[in-house]
Design a protein with these regions (language model features):
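Cap/lid segment of the alpha/beta-hydrolase catalytic domain
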Residues: 64-173, 359-370
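A short loop-to-beta-strand scaffold at the N-terminal edge of the catalytic core in hydrolase folds
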Residues: 46-64
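Alpha/beta-hydrolase fold nucleophile elbow
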Residues: 175-187
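Glycine-rich nucleophile elbow surrounding the catalytic serine of serine-hydrolase chemistry
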Residues: 185-195
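Short beta-strand immediately N-terminal to the catalytic nucleophile in serine-hydrolase-like folds
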Residues: 183-185, 210, 317
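Accessory cap/linker subdomain of secreted extracellular hydrolases
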Residues: 82, 94-97, 101-107, 113, ...
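Alpha/beta-hydrolase-fold serine-hydrolase catalytic core, especially in secreted/extracellular enzymes
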Residues: 23-38, 43-48, 202, 246, ...
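Bacterial Sec-dependent N-terminal signal peptides
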Residues: 1-23
């Protein structure tokens, strides 16, 4: 059965405030009082350890909510998760912190206010996580998911599905949870959310890939309809694609030094001359140059081709003005609709830039006004109720929603 949630702009002026949906203000002081942070290095099946920050509600707050335990909300990312308390070489640290990541007070605030366990994890090879980072690592686990370990020529095969599977196994055994896991993320984390669904871990009850990086040749990030996007591929890649020689908490800076206008810089030389500026240190840049056509290299990195017989509910979210991953959201939705007829499939789309729905006060794009707090509406009335229903059995089953341009008339239909 298909369900579509379409959030089409010009939102109502009186939507959710900066409070969490249950009225709780989630800030550093509140989090320090009601949550603890544990940092651990979770061992994967090939022996590598993945940095994981676990935010858990204190028992008193759970009792206040009338709960014995809450679900786990998992967020996996290649970007920094400061503040880091764990040092390279340490396995675990625990305690309270005075300053929490912005996401805990932003798009995760509703989950924190309801006593959920919030888990933030650096993917393999990024920051403190061990192993080699591979951009858009190909899915190798197969149609049955990542439960079984595959060994080829003595080497344990891993991908982002096996890593999320192993992480959830550890989390279920080492946190006080209700046995249910949700996964969400925007952009790269959207890609990892798709791979989480492909892991087919039985504890994952719902997932929301949002602007998921999906097909890096046909429409996402580095290419748009096969045309190389230099802003993403070159400038962004000049720092992000850099090899991290050992785990560390520091962001690697750009190796590209440009002392003039970017537009002029790109127009003033053929593509091959960029190698002189980038050197030979960016493995993925070199791979892009070696694969200028839509070949197996790119197709292997598209997880949407594997979205067959997905059983868990999926909320796919995208923005009409997303310059990075507009393609990925609608491609993911299309493939799920085509290949997973039993998936309870939802779509949320609006007039947002890349990840704009995570900005609670989002109300415009440049000079185009599209209404008050559309991000807050999405978080409070679309995303959180979706996960709350499937992970805690609260609320009503999501239905198709149309928001009229004036915001004065709203109707729900099956």
């Amino acid at each position: 059965m298909k369900r579509i949630i379409t959030v089409i702009a010009l939102m109502m002026s009186a939507l959710a405030s900066a409070f969490a949906q249950n009225g709780q203000i989630v800030d550093d002081n509140w989090l320090t009082e009601n949550y603890t942070r544990r940092e651990v290095m979770i061992e994967m099946r090939d022996g590598k350890h993945i940095y994981t920050a676990i935010y858990e509600p204190v028992q008193q707050y759970l009792e206040k909510l009338g709960k014995k335990a809450g679900p786990i909300m998992l967020f996996r990312t290649p970007y920094g998760l400061k503040p880091y308390g764990l040092k390279p070489g340490q396995i675990e640290t625990e305690g309270k912190v005075e300053k929490y990541p912005g996401g805990m007070k932003g798009d995760m605030a509703n989950y924190a206010a309801e006593g959920w366990i919030i888990v933030q994890q650096n993917v393999r090879g990024k920051f403190l996580s061990e192993g080699e980072y591979e951009n858009m690592r190909p899915y190798v686990s197969g149609p049955d998911g990542a439960a079984d370990t595959v060994v080829v020529k003595g080497v344990v095969q891993v991908d982002d599905a096996t890593d999320v599977y192993d992480s959830i196994e550890w989390l279920l055994k080492n946190t006080k949870n209700n046995g249910n896991v949700g996964v969400k993320g925007v952009s790269y984390p959207g890609f990892y959310t798709t791979l989480a669904a492909l892991s087919r871990h039985p504890a994952i009850k719902a997932a929301s890939p949002q602007a998921p990086a999906t097909d890096w040749f046909m429409g996402d990030d580095a290419h748009h309809n096969g045309a190389l996007c230099l802003a993403d591929a070159c400038r962004f890649g000049s720092s992000f694609y850099r090899h991290r020689p050992c785990p560390s908490t520091e962001r690697l800076g750009s190796i590209l030094k440009i002392d003039k206008d970017l537009y002029e810089f790109y127009l003033g030389r053929p593509l091959k001359e960029l190698d002189a500026f980038l050197g030979d240190s960016l493995r993925f840049w070199n791979q892009m140059m070696e694969h200028p056509d839509y070949d197996r290299f790119w197709k292997d990195r598209d997880p949407s081709a594997h979205l067959k017989n997905i059983k868990i509910p999926m909320l796919v979210t995208g923005g009409f003005y997303d310059a990075e991953d507009c393609y990925g959201a609608f491609r993911t939705y299309e493939m799920l609709k085509t290949m997973s007829p039993d998936c309870e499939l939802y779509l949320a789309a609006g007039p947002w830039y890349h990840g704009g729905w995570n900005n609670r006060t989002a109300n415009h794009l440049a000079d185009v006004w599209y209404g008050e707090k559309s991000g807050a509406y999405y978080q409070d009335d679309v995303e959180f109720p979706f996960f709350s229903y499937y992970l805690e059995g609260k609320g009503v089953k999501p239905v198709r929603v149309n928001v009229c341009p004036s915001g004065e008339s709203m109707r729900s239909v099956m």
